[in-house]
Regions:
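NAD(P)+-binding Rossmann beta1-loop-alpha1 motif at the extreme N-terminus of oxidoreductases
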Residues: 1-47
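Short beta-strand/turn micro-motifs composed of small residues
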Residues: 7, 30, 76, 102, ...
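Substrate/ligand-engaging "lid" and interaction regions
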Residues: 11, 128-231
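A general structural motif
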Residues: 23, 69, 93-95, 118, ...
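Hydrophobic/aromatic beta-strand patches that form the interior of the parallel beta-sheet core
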Residues: 27-29, 59, 73, 99, ...
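Rossmann-like NAD(P)-binding element
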Residues: 50-92
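Rossmann-like NAD(P)(H) cofactor-binding subdomain of soluble oxidoreductases
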Residues: 78-139
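NAD(P)-dependent Rossmann-like dehydrogenase/reductase catalytic/cofactor-binding core
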Residues: 204-211, 218, 225-359
Length: 359
C-alpha cells in the first residue's frame, strides 16, 4: 500500500516506522524533508531498537506526496487541519483513505469536502503510544503502547475496513466505534487540562505573578477535581440528550479514573506514575511565574476541545454553566485567537449537525 504520513514529529515518525516495517511504500510529507534519512527506527526506554524500516522518500511537494497515495495519515495539531485538508483535497485521489490521530479537535469537519466526494475519513481515538523524537527524521522513542485501539469513520459504514488497516499496522486489536462523534467528544484533555488550568490560574490577569506553581498532576487538589467532575457531568448530560448518536464510548472521567468522588479523583490523579513530575505550563519572569498562554494546554484544549463540547451542547439544547464559566475565564486572558467553529463548515443548527455525523 502507498502510504503518506503528514507530519514528521513524534507520532508521525512512529507511524512511519510501523508502516515501513510492514513493507508498505511510505512517503513522509514534512516541512523539512532534508532531515529525513531513508532508514527509521523505534527504540525503547533503554535505547534498544524494537522496530525499524525504510521509507521511500520525504518531500514537501504535495503533488509528490498525495497524488498516488492509497492512504494518508495526518499527525498535525487540530489548528492546522483546515489548511492541510485543502491541500489534500486538491492533490489526493477521491478513493484515498484519509486518517488522523488523535480523533478529537474537529478535524472531521475540515475534511467535509473530501468525504462528500467519496474519500473515507477516519480517526484513531487516542495516540497508540507515547512517542518522543530522539533524532528527528531518524529515531523515535516509543513506550506504553495501548492494548486496544479505537477507530471511528465517516461514513460509519467504512469503520471495519479502517479498523483492519490500523490493526494490521500496529499489531493491536482495534475496536470499531459506531459514530464518529464519540471521538469528537473525548473528554480527556479538553476537560482534564482546562479545569486544572482554571483552578491554578483563576485569579490571573496581566501583571499578576506567582512565586511558585504546583506540579500539574502530582499536586492536584480537590478544587480541580470538583470543577472537573462538574464539567464532566455536563458533557454526560449532552450525551444523554443525543441518543441516536450512540455516544456510549464517551466515557465519564469518573469511570475512566475509577473515582466517583472529589476526594477519590484527587487521590487517583495525583498518584498516576506516568503523570509524576509534569509541571504546570508557565513562563519564568524575573524569578516569578506566569501562565504560558502559548502552551497547547491553552491553545488546543480550550479552542479545539472544550469549545467544541460547548457547541455540541448548544445543538443538543443542554445548559453547561461550568463549561461556560471555564471558557469565559480563558477568553479574558487568552493571547492567541482562533477557535474551532462548526459554523465555519456550514453546520449552523441541529439539522446540519445531525446530517454531518449520521452518515
Amino acid at each position: 500500500m502507498r502510504i503518506t504520513v503528514v507530519g514528521g514529529g513524534n507520532i508521525g515518525t512512529q507511524f512511519m516506522v510501523h508502516c515501513a516495517s510492514k513493507g508498505h511504500d511510505v512517503t513522509a510529507y514534512t516541512s523539512k524533508p532534508e532531515v529525513f534519512g531513508s532508514h527509521l527506527n523505534i527504540v525503547d526506554e533503554n535505547e534498544v531498537t524494537t522496530l525499524e524500516g525504510d521509507i521511500r522518500k520525504a518531500t514537501n511537494d504535495p503533488s509528490e506526496a498525495f497524488s498516488d497515495a492509497d492512504f494518508i495519515m495526518i499527525t498535525l495539531p487540530s489548528s492546522m487541519m483546515r489548511d492541510i485538508a485543502s491541500v489534500i483535497y486538491e492533490h489526493a485521489r477521491p478513493d484515498a483513505i484519509i486518517g488522523v490521530v488523535p480523533g478529537n479537535g474537529g478535524s472531521e469537519c475540515a475534511f467535509g469536502k473530501s468525504i462528500e466526494r467519496g474519500n473515507t475519513f477516519f480517526a484513531i481515538e487516542r495516540v497508540p503510544a507515547i512517542a518522543r523524537l530522539v533524532v528527528k527524521g531518524r529515531t523515535v522513542r516509543s513506550m506504553g503502547y495501548r492494548g486496544e485501539l479505537h477507530v471511528a469513520s465517516l461514513p460509519a459504514s467504512e469503520v471495519d475496513r479502517c479498523c483492519e488497516l490500523i490493526s494490521s499496522i500496529y499489531d493491536k486489536p482495534c475496536k470499531p466505534i459506531p459514530n464518529y462523534l464519540n471521538l469528537t467528544m473525548t473528554p480527556s484533555n479538553p476537560i482534564l487540562h482546562t479545569t486544572r488550568l482554571r483552578t491554578i490560574f483563576g485569579d490571573y490577569k496581566p501583571g499578576v505573578v506567582y512565586d511558585s506553581l504546583p506540579l500539574f498532576y502530582e499536586e492536584w487538589d480537590d478544587a480541580s477535581s470538583r470543577l472537573l467532575i462538574a464539567c464532566d457531568e455536563e458533557e454526560q448530560s449532552i450525551c444523554k440528550a443525543l441518543p441516536e448518536f450512540r455516544l456510549e464510548f464517551v466515557k465519564s472521567l469518573r469511570i475512566h479514573y475509577e473515582s466517583p468522588t472529589v476526594e477519590a479523583m484527587t487521590a487517583k490523579i495525583s498518584w498516576i506514575p506516568a503523570f509524576r513530575g509534569l509541571t504546570t505550563p508557565s513562563v519564568e519572569v524575573d524569578g516569578k511565574y506566569i501562565p504560558d498562554l502559548h502552551s497547547r494546554y491553552f491553545t488546543a484544549d480550550f479552542s479545539y476541545g472544550l469549545s467544541i463540547i460547548k457547541q455540541i451542547g448548544v445543538f443538543a439544547g443542554v445548559d453547561t454553566p461550568n463549561i461556560d464559566e471555564t471558557l469565559d475565564w480563558y477568553e479574558r486572558i487568552r493571547i492567541e485567537q482562533g477557535d474551532f467553529s462548526y459554523s465555519d463548515y456550514g453546520i449552523n443548527d441541529f439539522d446540519d449537525f445531525r446530517k454531518f455525523y449520521l452518515r
